[in-house]
Design a protein with these regions (language model features):
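PLP-dependent amino-acid enzyme catalytic core
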Residues: 1-394
Length: 394
């Protein structure tokens, strides 16, 4: 199947109200202030892909590469670990009756309290890795649920961080519900990146963590003198990352915010279908996609509160487009610099490339020779064996 695009009829120009209850500037700045102090923090690269821009018939393509984030391979390193830190901070505060700094948790000052906490989450791979890292860094137990389609390599990477990994049959959405049930045990807490069930506070912390990536990208563009992008193509999934990008850009720039296009696999299109229906709606496909990190059938309710009026366009792409983008990025002659991107990592770029080739899509998305497009390379080769199978060595 070819790509599909739909315009969100509920989209509102400017800065719609209600964003602050989900992703606020105050929360974003708190996350940026905290995460930037962590050992291993470094601003990830922003690459200017001039050959890709030329091939797409636009002015610039900027690729924010999250493969090196905290050594965990994806932007998710910013969300789950931060949410674990914030949750433990609240638990210690409840016991001591005073606010404690996250740096105290990292030093192990309150290990007698935190070691009694078990955090649990479901994952397609990357979020669970971040939650497991946060548990290791800040001193609690971690249980991660993976579904049938999560590769052994991704599950092993989570176990290597000290988490207990439980493999279930069924889909990602089934594992989300199972994690919510487990979290009802005494001493257990859910750290989810979707709010279909469970602790909204942790889900909000996850999205605030993601804004660190967005703020870095805007700062890098400002320093490069290229200015604000005209468009941002973001990955879909349950919507958490897309909502963080949407809210942060709309709050900063209002009616001058970039046009946002959310990109999903054609067989895992819950956000696309929700935009058509005007309400959270299940994906129509069977969720079988090479883009494992985007294999989600149900929308995050919290994320949808931002996206339902904040994002103008939603699109779906076939697996073939994602693999083509991986191969293009790996070929320095075609991309301008060699970049290693996982199956979901280049999905935003894949959406841009597909749309740029179609005159009707270009017109609908207002893509032209003056367009400056930002995309997020959300993951590196988090399953190296699969990457090598999909991207032939050159």
């Amino acid at each position: 199947m070819a790509f599909r695009i739909t315009r969100n009829r509920a989209w509102s120009h400017g800065a719609p109200g209600g964003f602050d209850a989900v992703v606020s500037l105050q929360g974003a700045r708190a996350a940026q202030s905290e995460i930037s102090t962590w050992p291993g923090y470094a601003v990830t690269p922003l690459y200017h892909l001039a050959p890709v821009a030329s091939a797409c018939g636009i002015d610039h393509v900027f690729y924010k590469d999250e493969a090196s984030r905290f050594g965990l391979g994806s932007f998710k390193a910013l969300g789950g670990a931060y949410a674990v830190a914030r949750l433990l901070q609240r638990r210690v505060q409840d016991r001591l009756g005073r606010l404690v700094a996250i740096s105290e948790l990292a030093r192990g000052d309150h290990r007698a309290i935190t070691q009694c906490v078990t955090v649990v989450s479901a994952t397609d791979g990357n979020h669970g890795r971040s939650v497991a890292a946060g548990a290791a860094w800040f001193g609690c137990r971690c249980v991660i649920l993976v579904h049938a389609d999560v590769s052994d390599r991704r599950a092993e990477a989570i176990e290597a961080l000290g988490a207990d990994v439980i493999r279930l049959t069924g889909t990602y959405d089934d594992s989300v519900r199972a994690a919510a049930r487990l979290s009802r045990q005494p001493g257990w807490s859910l750290v989810a990146d979707t709010s279909t069930a469970g602790d909204e506070e942790a889900c909000i912390d996850v999205m605030h963590g993601y804004t660190v990536m967005v703020a870095e990208a805007f700062d890098q563009l400002s320093q490069s003198l290229h200015g604000l992008p005209t468009h941002i193509f973001t990955q879909g999934g349950v919507g958490g990352m897309a909502a963080a990008v949407c809210a942060h850009s709309r709050q900063l720039f209002g009616e001058h915010a970039p046009i946002q296009v959310v990109v999903e696999p054609e067989r895992a299109d819950c956000l696309f279908q929700s935009a058509i229906a005007g309400a959270p709606t299940r994906a129509t496909g069977d969720l079988k996609t090479i883009m494992a990190g985007l294999s989600c059938g149900e929308v995050s309710q919290l994320a949808w509160r931002v996206l339902e009026r904040g994002t103008e366009f939603f699109m779906t792409i076939p697996d073939r487009a994602a693999v083509d983008a991986m191969r293009l990025l790996a070929d320095a002659a075609r991309s301008g610099t060699r970049i290693i991107a996982g199956e979901s990592g280049g999905a935003g770029l894949a959406g841009l490339i597909e749309a740029s080739r179609d005159p009707d899509a270009r017109a609908e998305l207002r893509l032209d020779r003056e367009s400056r497009v930002l995309v997020f390379g959300t993951e590196g080769a988090t399953d190296p064996v699969l990457y090598d199978a999909l991207v032939p060595a050159r």
